[in-house]
Structures are given as structure tokens and as C-alpha cells.
């Protein structure tokens, strides 16, 4: 590496969080590095806050006549000077830090010799924006789903333009953080040390391999793979986890399949942890597409060996993957109201039911009976359970897979009866359930036998877990569904 290349690496290089495989995991830094990193963190935090409240700041600035060229120039000069000072201090600090110079040299060599990148950098945990790419997703034809919208352009051009601009600002300033709190810069900063320590444990204790994937959108996906193929029959099955709206693979649902000795591939959604981008529907499906391609083309798993295990809003990328990879082994899964609906349908449209009905393979839904997040009515426990959104998913699956059976109000009522039943009542409802679900003579079934068959199908597609939204899944419920 030439002196010029080294200097450029020190200026643009990523922050190193920690050593992974050393007894002392703390990566050394000097006072100049600490002060400069603090300056950059403060400025980035100010930028994030200002972005969130930008509509109000602009309104205040306009009312006080602050939106003029002189003030813009002063703000630009201050920002540029601030960043130049911070980056210069950081660069000087890195010049006097032999450990960072060693890391910069390792990173430079890793980019020159891509096939050795993982082995060269495996000892460091650092910002992944500068990491070599382990896998690039291919651009292939995919299915995309969109909920039908009732919002169209109106004759009032001014109203439409105002609505679109206002909704865009709300969606990408604070609505995104409400839908996906895991993408909030503040939350990522607060739990950063916890994520770093858990990544180290996955590598050291579980033998995990970290992978950096490039999506067709140009985002980087931070992934972690634990290979158990040499450790028993379950290891030949790869469980791809899809976390919730505040979940990370470092702290999420990976432990459940790992405890049962499955191979596991975890990944972070766009904007979560070290994954780049924003958690919009388009970028999210591009990320899960890259993850599945990585599992097939790089890790060597067949599509039939892959199981998708999703939690909460992770059902959106999970159902998209199921719809686009049909051979996977299994899927587990007022005044402002018009504006809110328009924002969600336009910027955060996640048609989980539509995507799930496009998948015809084996699956099981796990309904959390005490769930406080995915309900639409507060009230008694019976009222909350009746509005659990898992109920709607079950009905969508039944209508799509068994249209001759679920085709009227009586059939839907039979499903509702089963959904509201206690475990003992369900035993009674399904005691005469046929061992083989022969669907050929539905028209000739009596109403009683038809209801028995519906209850039997419900018991195959959905199981209850007596827990709230954030309780880890009980190991006894993590079973690979089979076709029937």
C-alpha cells in the first residue's frame, strides 16, 4: 500500500468496534479519535432530529424570514468547517494508532483479494459500509404484490400535490420510525454495544460466519450464518429468520432453531444495525431476495431445504419469499385517518395475505393469544383474541387453498367458532377429524361433516401460543410443517 492509499484509507475508513477473537475485545483508540467520533455522532444526531421535525423547522424559519441566501451560506460554511475539523482530527488520531493502521492495511488487502476477505477480516467487528461484498444478488424476474388502493388523483391538483408532499415528508421523517423503530438511529446507538457483544458470541460460541450481501437496490445486508450440516439430521435444514420491527438477528429469534440444532441464517432489515438503506417494502423484499439467493448459490442449500421462520412484521418479507420461492420446505410465521391510510398504503404497503396465498407449500401460523400489538380492538381478552390479525391470515389461506370448502358465511362462521374455542373445546370439535383430508367430495358433505373438515384444516394451519407479542417462542412449537 502506497502512502497516498494509506492516507485515503485512514480518511475514509470505517470505525472499528471491537476485536472478535481476542480475550481483550476492546479496540484501542486515542483522544483525537474519541473526540472526533463524538463530534461526528453529535452532528449525525442533530441531522436525524432536524429531519424528523423538518416540516416544523421550515415553517418557523419561513415565518421569521430566515430562508434567505445569506443564512444558507452561513449554515453551509459552519457544516463544512465542522466536518473538516472532525475528520481531520480523526485522521490524525488514526495515523498515531498502530492498531488502526494494521486494520486499514488488512481491509485494503481484503478488497484486492476478495476470496480471502472473510479470513482476513474475521477478527474485527467494524462498520460494514467499507466491507468487501461476499455475495451480490442477481437481477431476476420476481412477483410483486400491491394492495388495491382507493386513493387516486383528484381533480383538485393543489390538494393532490399538497397531500402527496405532506404524506411523503411524514412517511420518511417520523412515520417510518413508528412502523420500524429498529431503524431509528437513536435506538441503534443505544443498543450498539449489546449488538456488538452478541455478534461476538455468535461467532465465538456458535461458530457463526458473518456475510455482507449486496441487494439489487445497492444496499448492504448484514447476515450471520451458523452451519450445522455436520452435526445431525436437523442441520441439513436451513432456517432463515425474519425479525420483527424492532428486532435484530443479534437479539432476536435465532436461538430457537439453534437450540434444536438447525442450520440458521439471520439477517437485519434495511436500516437495522449494520444493514444499509431504509425499511421500505421495496428495499425489504430486495434484502430477503438477496438472503435467499445467498443461501442457495453461496451456502449450497437447495430450495427444498429452506424453512422461513418469521416474527411479527417479519411476516412481510417471509411471505414475499414464500411467494417467489414456492419450493421452500416450509413457512412459519379519525380526522387524520385518511392521511394515515394513504401513507401506509403508499409508502409502507405490506400485503402479507396476498403474498401468502401465492405460496402453496406447507406452513403453520402461530397465533399469540395474549398479543397486544397485532389486534384492532382493545377490550376483554375475548375481544382482543377475536381481532388478532392471525385470524385474517388463516381465513385468507383457507379461502385460497380450499375455495370449494370456504365459500360462504356458514364456512367462515365455522372458522370463527374454532378460533374462539378453548383447547378442550377444540379437542371435541376435531375428534372425528378424518385421518386423510380428501377434498374430492365436498359437495356431498353434510353441514356437520363440512364443519368438522374445516376445524380439522384450521388445526393443521394454525396453533396457539399463550403469550404476549415479545415472548420468545417455546421450543415445543418450533416444528417443521408437512404437506397434507
PLM features: residue spans?
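N-terminal targeting or regulatory segments adjacent to alpha/beta-hydrolase or S9 domains
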Residues: 1-199, 474-484
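Cap/lid segment of the alpha/beta-hydrolase catalytic domain
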Residues: 254-255, 266-285
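Alpha/beta-hydrolase active-site loop
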Residues: 278-300
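Gly/Ala-rich beta-loop-alpha elbow adjacent to hydrolase catalytic centers
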Residues: 309-318
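Active-site signature of alpha/beta-hydrolase-fold catalytic machinery across serine-
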Residues: 320-324
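A conserved short beta-strand
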Residues: 326-331
Amino acid at each position: 500500500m502506497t502512502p497516498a492509499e494509506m492516507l485515503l484509507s485512514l480518511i475514509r475508513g470505517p470505525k472499528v468496534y471491537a476485536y472478535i477473537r481476542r480475550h481483550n475485545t476492546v479496540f484501542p483508540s486515542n483522544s483525537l479519535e474519541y473526540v472526533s467520533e463524538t463530534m461526528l455522532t453529535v452532528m449525525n444526531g442533530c441531522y436525524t432530529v432536524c429531519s424528523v421535525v423538518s416540516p416544523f423547522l421550515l415553517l418557523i424559519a419561513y415565518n421569521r424570514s430566515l430562508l434567505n441566501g445569506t443564512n444558507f451560506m452561513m449554515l453551509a460554511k459552519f457544516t463544512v468547517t465542522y466536518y473538516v475539523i472532525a475528520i481531520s482530527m480523526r485522521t490524525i488520531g488514526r495515523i498515531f494508532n498502530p492498531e488502526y493502521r494494521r486494520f486499514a492495511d488488512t481491509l485494503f488487502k481484503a478488497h484486492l483479494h476478495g476470496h480471502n476477505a472473510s479470513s482476513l477480516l474475521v477478527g474485527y467487528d467494524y462498520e460494514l459500509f467499507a466491507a468487501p461484498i461476499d455475495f451480490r444478488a442477481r437481477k431476476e424476474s420476481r412477483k410483486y404484490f400491491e394492495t388495491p388502493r382507493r386513493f387516486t388523483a383528484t381533480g383538485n391538483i393543489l390538494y393532490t400535490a399538497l397531500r402527496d408532499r405532506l404524506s411523503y415528508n411524514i412517511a420518511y421523517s417520523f412515520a417510518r420510525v413508528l412502523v420500524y423503530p429498529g431503524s431509528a438511529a437513536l435506538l441503534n446507538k443505544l443498543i450498539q454495544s449489546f449488538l456488538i457483544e452478541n455478534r461476538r458470541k455468535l461467532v465465538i460460541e456458535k461458530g457463526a460466519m458473518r456475510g455482507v450481501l449486496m441487494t439489487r437496490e445497492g444496499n448492504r445486508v448484514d447476515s450471520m450464518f451458523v452451519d450445522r450440516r455436520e452435526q445431525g439430521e436437523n442441520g441439513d435444514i436451513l432456517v432463515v429468520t425474519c425479525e420483527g420491527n424492532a428486532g435484530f438477528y443479534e437479539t432476536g429469534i435465532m436461538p430457537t432453531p439453534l437450540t434444536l440444532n438447525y442450520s440458521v441464517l439471520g439477517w437485519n432489515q434495511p436500516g437495522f444495525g449494520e444493514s444499509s438503506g431504509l425499511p421500505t417494502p421495496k428495499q425489504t423484499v430486495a434484502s430477503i431476495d438477496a438472503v435467499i439467493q445467498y443461501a442457495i448459490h453461496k451456502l449450497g442449500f437447495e430450495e427444498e431445504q429452506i424453512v422461513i421462520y418469521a416474527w411479527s412484521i417479519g411476516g412481510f418479507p417471509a411471505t414475499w419469499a414464500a411467494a417467489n420461492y414456492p419450493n421452500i420446505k416450509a413457512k412459519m410465521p379519525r380526522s387524520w385517518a385518511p392521511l394515515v391510510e394513504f401513507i401506509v398504503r403508499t409508502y409502507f404497503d405490506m400485503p402479507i395475505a396476498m403474498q401468502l396465498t401465492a405460496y402453496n407449500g406447507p406452513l403453520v401460523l402461530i397465533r399469540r393469544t395474549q398479543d397486544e400489538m397485532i389486534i384492532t380492538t382493545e377490550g376483554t381478552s375475548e375481544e382482543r383474541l377475536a381481532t388478532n390479525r392471525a385470524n385474517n391470515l388463516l381465513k385468507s389461506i383457507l379461502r385460497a387453498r380450499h375455495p370449494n370448502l370456504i365459500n360462504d358465511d356458514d364456512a367462515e362462521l365455522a372458522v370463527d367458532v374454532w378460533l374462539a374455542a378453548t383447547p378442550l373445546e377444540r379437542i371435541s370439535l376435531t375428534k372425528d377429524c378424518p385421518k386423510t383430508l380428501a377434498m374430492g367430495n365436498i359437495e356431498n358433505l353434510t353441514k356437520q361433516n363440512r364443519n368438522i373438515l374445516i376445524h380439522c384444516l384450521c388445526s393443521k394451519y394454525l396453533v396457539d401460543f399463550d403469550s404476549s407479542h415479545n415472548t420468545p417462542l417455546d421450543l415445543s412449537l418450533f416444528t417443521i410443517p408437512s404437506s397434507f
